[in-house]
């Protein structure tokens, strides 16, 4: 990983020579970050139930998971969409009409349309994976960034939502 890739998502300036929102100016497709708490499976299922399989967008699901939990999310969500659902892998390019899931014990970012996985840092129990991804998404996709916050508790996602709005992207929050 280069020196700049390790910057905190949402830092000012350029990263590896790519200005904020440059990817969106190159005619790329929208990338939708979907944040949900550990109990948000039902909301996620309903969300994907109502989407066509050919949206032309990519979806990245950031869900709070217990580090010791073996997630069956890919299998469960596959029953609610015809899009390909898979666990995110480091360096994986994001493609249209696919759903990517954050693995347990990982932090997920996006840079130049590729997913970047890192070991989750222990910050005294404070982990904000939705904020981290949304801020990176805003920086990478600019006005094509979309943030969706589903059922949850706490403030995870608030800073990321602000970053997406500031980048000209769109934000939706479940009541």
Locate each region found by the language model.
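Conserved acid/base catalytic micro-environments in cytosolic active-site loops
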Residues: 1-175
């Amino acid at each position: 990983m280069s020196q700049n890739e390790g910057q905190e998502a949402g830092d000012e300036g350029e990263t590896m020579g790519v200005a904020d929102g440059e990817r969106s100016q190159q005619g790329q497709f929208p990338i939708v970050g979907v944040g949900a708490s550990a109990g948000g499976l039902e909301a996620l299922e309903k969300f994907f139930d109502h989407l066509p399989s050919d949206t032309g967008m990519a979806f990245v699901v950031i869900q709070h998971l217990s580090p010791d939990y073996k997630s069956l999310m890919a299998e469960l969500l596959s029953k609610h969409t015809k899009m390909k659902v898979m666990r995110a892998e480091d360096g994986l390019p994001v493609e249209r009409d696919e759903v990517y899931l954050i693995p347990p014990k990982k932090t997920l970012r996006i840079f130049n349309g590729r997913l970047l996985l890192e070991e989750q840092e222990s910050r005294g129990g404070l982990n904000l994976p939705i904020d981290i991804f949304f801020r990176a998404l805003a920086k990478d996709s600019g006005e094509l960034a979309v943030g969706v916050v589903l059922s949850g508790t706490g403030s995870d996602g608030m800073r990321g939502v602000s970053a997406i709005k500031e980048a000209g992207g769109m934000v939706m929050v479940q009541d």
